[in-house]
Structure formats: structure tokens, C-alpha cells
Amino acid sequence: NLRVVTNSINVASICARNSSFDVVVACGTVRHRDNGIVGASAERFIREFRVDYGIIGISGIDEEGNLLDYDYREVAVARTIIECSRRVFLVTDRSKFGRPAMVRVAHLSDINALFTDGPIDTKWADLIHEHGVELFMV
């Protein structure tokens, strides 16, 4: 049995197909471009939990190891997920390395593992390992 706490309608819909999953969905404002649930209500809801694994996504990673996004509302939710998780996994595709964005979510040192969609430049792999983050290229 697995309990999934999410701020994503899409993730909830996929997980709900498995009857052994207990799916808990945050309340808040639906962001139409990706069906993410954001806002103060979502943050307060997520803050009620202490989860083993938190999974976040981002819009960019800069050369200092800052994790970046464009939507300040999603950033607040991602920060809350980081605070409430024993281990934090970042899932991002290769295009996000070196991509600028306006709002800082966190730093590489705040996550435990990074999952990406294939080989990345050595400078990025070195930066990731330098901060003690496990790197998985899948």
C-alpha cells in the first residue's frame, strides 16, 4: 500500500488507477497549463504531512546549482514539499540545465537525487555530485 500526496490532478488521476494506492490531493487553485494545484491552500495542506519521498520539478538549473522556476506559486508549493520530505527527488529533462528562470526554488544541496532523461554535460554531472546528490539518467 502506498499513500500519494500530490498537488497535481494529472498525477492523482494516474495513481488512482491502482487500487492499492491511497491518493490524497491538495486543495487550491488549478493552474490550467499543467493541472497543478497551487496557492496558499495547497501549501497549508501539504504542510500537514511528513512524507518519506518528495518529488519536485523545475524550469531551470543555473551554474551555481540554484533550482529555478517561473511561477512563484509553484515555487512556494515546491519549497513546502522540500520542507516536509525526508528525501527529495528532482525530476527534470536535459533541457533545463543552464536554462534561466526568475524564481529560486532551492539549491542542489537541498535535494537527495536528480533524475533526468539521458546523458548530460560533464560540468553538470560534476556540479550535481559536488553537492552530494545522486544522479540517475534514465
What is each of the regions a protein language model found here?
Residues 4-5:
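Conserved SAM-binding loop
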Residues 9-138:
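Conserved phosphate- and dinucleotide-binding cores of soluble alpha/beta proteins
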